[in-house]
Amino acid sequence: MIKTVGCIFADSMEYGPFLSRAKEMGGKESIRRGNESVEITLDENGRSLRVIGVKCGIGKVNAASATAFLIADDGVDFILNAGLSGAVHGLKREDMIAATTYIECDFDLTAIGYAPGVKADGQKYLYEADKDLLDLAMQSKGIIAAKVGTGDIFLADPVKKEFFRNTFGIESFDMETAAIAGVCDKLGVPMLSLRKISDDADGDAYETYREMNERQEACLTDLLFNILKRYLKADSLWK
């Protein structure tokens, strides 16, 4: 049996460790819909997992389009996202999180009577991680389950950070996950986002984020491949 997973990364620094690991394993690079990509296959006990890594670019539109392309063009069975994010509440630098709930914090129809984040016509606006993928991630030591917010801003404003915390109850903030989750939810594709906390989403956020981003650490790639190995061994996910 063969399944396909799409692994989405925003920028070169986040994608780099995954690309290096994939190339060491014989991965083949290509361009998919304008995005850098690499593909490998993992095999175990008669099961094959086709793994497609994509560097989508920073922000919601880039993330959403890459997700839609992977689903439409490659028929992925599930999506994993990995990258850095800012701490909003209860987290600190170097923490590793598996995101449980996703919301677009910058979606704003308050001028026409909606609450912050709420979409018109009853459209869903709060998305949940796939339980099976989340369970696989939480088997890794030290992983923290957290609610994340997303927006097309690099969050470095303490006032806005506090507003997002109080309004949405988020613990972390990034620029892609809720967009990926929204596409996956609409198309019925399981997804999970994995994040490492790089900064405190405050006035010093850029410097601390840049310092961690430039290190190009392999910890998220390690976590991602551990999840994929567990997925291959999980009989209940291959029925």
Explain the meaning of each model-derived region.
Residues 1, 75, 92, 144, ...:
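Short loop/turn motifs at secondary-structure junctions
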Residues 178, 182-212:
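Zn-dependent metallopeptidase/amidohydrolase metal-coordination segment
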Residues 111-172, 178-187:
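Active-site rim beta-loop-alpha module in soluble metabolic enzymes
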Residues 102, 152, 195-198:
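Short, small-residue-rich loop/turn micro-motifs
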Residues 51-57, 147-149, 194:
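Active-site-proximal beta-strand elements of phosphoester/diester hydrolases
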Residues 2-128:
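Metabolite-binding pocket within alpha/beta catalytic cores that recognizes anionic/polar moieties
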Residues 18-19, 91, 109, 158-161, ...:
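Short, well-ordered secondary-structure micro-motifs
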Residues 201-239:
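His/Asp/Glu-rich mid-to-C-terminal helical/loop segments that flank catalytic regions of hydrolases
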